[in-house]
Amino acid sequence: MQFKRLSDLIARGELQGKRVFIRADLNVPQDSTGNITEDTRIRASVPAIQQALQAGAAVMVTSHLGRPVEGEFKPADTLAPIAQRLSELLGQPVALKQNWVDGVDVAPGQVVLLENCRVNKGEKKNDDALAQKIAALCDVYVNDAFGTAHRAEATTHGIAKYAPVACAGPLLAAELDALGKALGEPASPLVAIVAGSKVSTKLTILKTLADKVDNLIVGGGIANTFMLAAGLKIGKSLAEADLLGDAKAIIDMMAKRGASVPIPVDVVCAKEFAPTAAATVKDVADVADDDMILDIGPKTAELLARQIAQAGTIVWNGPVGVFEFDQFANGTKTLAYAIAESKGFSVAGGGDTLAAIAKYDIGDKIDYISTGGGAFLEFLEGKTLPAVAILEERAQG
């Protein structure tokens, strides 16, 4: 992927005295009184802002927060708590500007936060007139919001068409570099772990990866559907009978090119889905009609851990069992530690995956943890991300 980078512009001294517009992802969770409960995204936005300030730029930053109604600003939509947190992290004042589309006063060395961009009429529809107005505010546009890269909106796509210069910030660039390395030019064998409750939500990803990977490890409800497709009994476990044909096609497609979807040899079952449910390890042939499969068994976990240990590249999206309940967490825990210890290049993403990484404290052992949510999944699906495509287009001239 070829795109301009903020770091290159800074290295060439091209930000001195310039007006820089940074689209960040500051969409953080808040409690009922508006206090920020988790500030990872705000902290992740700081390097781009600091780099631009140190390079002598006048810096404007914006983001969406929640799902406001366009043209109807409500107190709950405000970025005020974020301005305060940014100010603490940067060690300098961060003024919050409202009604900013028609002009912003900011001097070199200063940073201002522009109020919730999704309140502007036309933002979500990528309105061309709005995009041109916003682009006129700056000399350099920086997209540092991978989490919204799959959406074509006025501050993620339209502005990049019209700003004099459009580039990727450090967060976006690192994300694209890591995902490009994992899927564009992967060291083999390439192992993907795709887990979740439903095949239907991840069918496109499964089909795309089935073309690329050496081992496609499935977990959760997805694995149950694949077990059914392989002719195994799954009791009363969650599965999608209408997608058996798709699961069979993926198994056959991979087998034809010497790749595999490893089907579990043992599983952890319970009679009910509850935090106190009794867990029983069973060989797959012994699953009873009233059993629910809630994790892969220890033999399966060990076999998969060996495949992960030999991998050149690992892409991880989803825990393989109900890891929130400790008695059904062994599969996810075993694979998490195998990924952490593997010498292969590892990329992980998705909310539940991030929760598992936090639970087993392996964040520093994963090569790249994607903050992207929906954008990460669309990248895995092989889709073009509009916000990235426009940066590539601008880089070509």
From Swiss-Prot:
Gene3D superfamilies: Phosphoglycerate kinase, N-terminal domain
Binding residues for ATP: K202, E324, G350, G351, D352, T353
Top-level taxon: Bacteria
Record-listed E.C. numbers: 2.7.2.3
Localization, UniProt: Cytoplasm
GO molecular function list: ADP binding; ATP binding; phosphoglycerate kinase activity
Main enzyme class: transferase
Record bears the keyword Kinase: yes
Residues involved in substrate binding: D25, L26, N27, R41, H64, L65, G66, R67, R118, R151
BP term (GO), one: glycolytic process
Disulfide bonds: none
Reaction equation(s) it catalyzes: (2R)-3-phosphoglycerate + ATP = (2R)-3-phospho-glyceroyl phosphate + ADP
Keyword Transferase annotated: yes
GO cellular component: cytosol
Pfam families given in the database record: PGK (PF00162)
InterPro entries with a match to the protein in the record: Phosphoglycerate_kinase, Phosphoglycerate_kinase_CS, Phosphoglycerate_kinase_N, Phosphoglycerate_kinase_sf
Keyword terms of this UniProt record: ATP-binding, Cytoplasm, Glycolysis, Kinase, Nucleotide-binding, Transferase
Main location: cytoplasm
PROSITE patterns in the record: PGLYCERATE_KINASE
Known pathway: Carbohydrate degradation; glycolysis; pyruvate from D-glyceraldehyde 3-phosphate: step 2/5
Family: Belongs to the phosphoglycerate kinase family.
Complex and partners: Monomer.
Protein name: Phosphoglycerate kinase
